[in-house]
Swiss-Prot record:
Belongs to the heat shock protein 70 family. Keywords: ATP-binding, Chaperone, Nucleotide-binding, Phosphoprotein, Stress response. Acts as a chaperone. HAMAP family: DnaK. GO terms for molecular function: ATP binding; ATP-dependent protein folding chaperone; unfolded protein binding. Induction: By stress conditions e.g. heat shock. This is Chaperone protein dnaK1. InterPro entries: ATPase_NBD, Chaperone_DnaK, Heat_shock_70_CS, HSP70_C_sf, HSP70_peptide-bd_sf, Hsp_70_fam. The modification Phosphothreonine is found at residue 197.
Length: 651
């Protein structure tokens, strides 16, 4: 059995880890970072960039750079108006009212975009481990709906991963914290504020059991919202100073977003920071520059409502667990946004104790997912751990009068199954419509509908006589199945809830195959880019030789070498050339350079050779003739990881 990786698929950044020798290890990406930006970009010629490479070119390619896709996954069009207004890329209605992303002449589902990020993490893990990776544990916010969980699982399948388990992010963080504290009985509060979501979970740890007591949260609150507060302030200040509205300028907005994120990070360690964006725009009087000073106190004033919004879920989670604040033994801060001093102070005041800082807030969730992978893979060091998670929202049916009747209450331990008996609402009724909802509101339509199906063939009878058993079954991933059985006839109907407007198994397989093809195409493009870098070094060596010694070369020799050089130059701009063809032309050019180097040596060193020993002459000739190739090899080595991009990199 191969390694099972743990993935924290975040709104702004993602992280991958694995259990090695019983210890969780964060896997660095190809660029050397321990986290990878959850960003996908499409270049001018259709090339796909993921992670740091995509982030670097976002300013000059804002419309084709996709970020915060996690805010759209598994959600319907009408639910995402606010999020759609905040991104520069085009969102379009997808199938069954879901959200798709339009890039030039093609649309992508959020699952496909997420799969591209997952595929990058998978490739980095394979490079690190030196073996194929096919299985993973992926984390989601505790307050993710059934539809969002299923969509995340679909994204994993598209990326070529068998998702063994979907677990909640706060629960994963508790595993990272408690892996070496299994002998301690304690109640912990996990405060998880990431880039786009916020969760609070209360867990009971002891004797190798990690039991979630309750969970609460807000899927619309995260670090992105703090960034947007700064962006809105910058827009207002600049409009007041210069009379220019930057809100419709996508390139300027992307620069403001990056500057806002940078300022937010800096204000976690300093009391004031400068935001300087030269040439942000221009009018008839010339270019305009944005120069502003942002203090921590001003930042906290701008974001005070966001900080306060974290209070209610904490109160709810503690109440649902049947505890008081005083009974909380430890408070864990998870997610990069918990570095904001105002957040730390609020948590400290609410809980009456300093938060525990023993886990890395950026890496804890991925580490916990890797530990869960070890549990599923029966790793010796963790095989006896038991993780008991809960469902974050109540699940039930619409009954007579549009009332929402709960079958499974929120914070029920998973996996679980519950059956409730219903009857018909009118005489002679032969069909029952079963509408499944998720939420806490008393009226069904105010909650999120997950599915709707019919049980037919019910024997005609007076109202209230037929007995229909409806069973709700939630697996360990938090994914729901519903079945209905008529006791009299034995007729049964069931449905495994996948998000309405979600992907069928055939669509997932098609997208998975496309992702594999794209991965192969991307690999070929990377290989061609690397070969062209090597070829460029050879051409440079040729041009240098001609510049310094061309006058001494015979026309016949130049006529013989020139077609080889021209063939190599043509390969540098041919979009349809294959790696094998480039290698073939490079070999021809290398042979030509060896010949050229030998002739140059004989012409420049011929006089001294007459007085040198034959052995020295041969050694000198060998050195001179291969000098070009040696320098070329050095250049090749230095450019191993180079990727050609059409866009300017802006740090």
């Amino acid at each position: 059995m191969g390694k099972i990786i743990g993935i924290d698929l975040g709104t702004t950044n993602s992280c991958v880890a694995v259990l090695e020798g019983g210890n969780p290890v964060v896997i660095p990406n190809a660029e050397g970072g321990r986290t990878t930006p959850s960003i996908v970009a499409f270049g001018k010629s259709g090339e796909r960039l993921v992670g740091q490479l995509a982030k670097r070119q976002a300013i000059t390619n804002a419309e084709n750079t996709i970020f915060s896709i996690k805010r759209f996954i598994g959600r319907r069009w009408e639910e995402t108006a606010q999020e759609r207004a905040r991104v520069p890329y085009a969102c379009v209605p997808g199938r069954d009212g879901m959200v798709d992303v339009q890039i030039r002449d093609r649309t992508y589902t959020p699952q496909e975009i997420s799969a591209m990020v997952l595929q990058k993490l998978k490739q980095d893990a394979e490079a690190y481990l030196g073996e194929p990776v096919t299985q993973a544990v992926i984390t989601v916010p505790a307050y993710f709906s059934d539809a969002q969980r299923q969509a995340t699982k679909d994204a994993g399948a598209i990326a070529g991963l068998e998702v063994l388990r979907i677990i909640n992010e706060p629960t994963a963080a508790s595993l990272a914290y408690g892996i070496d504290k299994q002998d301690q009985d304690q109640t912990i509060l996990v405060f998880d504020l990431g880039g786009g979501t916020f969760d609070v979970s209360i867990l009971q740890l002891g004797d190798g059991v990690f039991e979630v007591r309750s969970t609460a949260g807000n899927n619309h609150l995260g670090g992105d919202n703090f960034d947007e507060c700064i962006v809105d302030w910058l827009l207002a200040c600049f409009k007041e100073q210069e009379g220019i509205d930057l809100s419709k300028d996508k390139m300027a907005l992307q620069r403001l977003r990056e500057a806002a994120e940078k300022a937010k990070v800096e204000l976690s360690g300093t009391l004031s920071t400068s935001i300087n964006l030269p040439f942000i725009t221009a009018d008839e009087t010339g270019p305009k520059h944005l120069e502003m000073e942002l203090t921590r106190s001003k930042f906290e004033e701008l974001c005070a409502h966001l900080v306060q919004a974290t209070l209610e879920p904490m109160q709810q989670a503690i109440a649902d667990a049947g505890l008081t604040v005083e009974e909380i033994d430890r408070v864990l801060l998870v997610g990069g946004s918990t570095r904001i001093p105002a957040i730390q102070e609020l948590v400290k005041q609410f809980c009456g104790k300093n938060p525990d800082r023993s886990v890395n807030p950026d890496e804890a969730v991925a580490i916990g997912a890797a530990i869960q992978g070890g549990i599923l893979g029966k790793e010796t060091t963790v095989k006896d751990l038991l993780l008991l998670d809960v469902t974050p929202l109540s699940l039930g049916l619409e009954t007579l009068g549009g009332v929402f009747t709960k079958i499974i209450e929120r914070n029920t331990t998973l996996p679980t199954s519950k059956t409730q008996t219903f009857s018909t609402a009118s005489d002679g009724q032969t069909v029952v419509e079963i509408a499944v909802y998720q939420g806490e509101r008393p009226i069904a339509k105010d909650n999120k509908q997950l599915a709707c199906f019919e049980l037919t063939g019910i024997a005609p009878a007076p109202r209230g006589v037929p007995q229909i058993d409806v069973t709700f079954d939630i697996d360990a991933n938090g994914i729901l199945s519903v079945s209905a059985v008529d006791r009299a006839t034995g007729r049964q109907q069931s449905v495994r809830i996948t998000n309405r407007g979600g992907l069928s198994s055939m669509e997932i397989e098609r997208m998975r195959q496309e992702a594999q093809i794209y991965a192969q195409v991307d690999q070929i493009k990377k290989e061609i880019a690397e070969l062209r870098n090597q070829a460029d070094a050879l051409l440079y060596s040729y041009e240098s030789t001609i510049k310094n010694h061309g006058i001494t070369l015979s026309p016949e020799l130049r006529a013989r070498i020139e077609p080889v050089v021209q063939s190599m130059q043509a390969a540098m701009v041919d979009d349809n050339i294959t790696p094998d063809e480039i290698r073939k032309r490079m070999e021809a050019l290398q042979q030509a350079l060896v010949t050229l180097g030998s002739v140059v040596y004989q012409q420049t060193a011929g006089g001294s050779m007459m007085t040198s020993t034959p052995t020295m002459g041969r050694a000198t000739m060998s050195s001179q003739a291969t000098q070009v190739l040696d320098s070329e090899a050095t250049i090749i080595s230095d450019n191993e990881e180079t990727v050609v991009s059409d866009y300017e990199a802006v740090d």
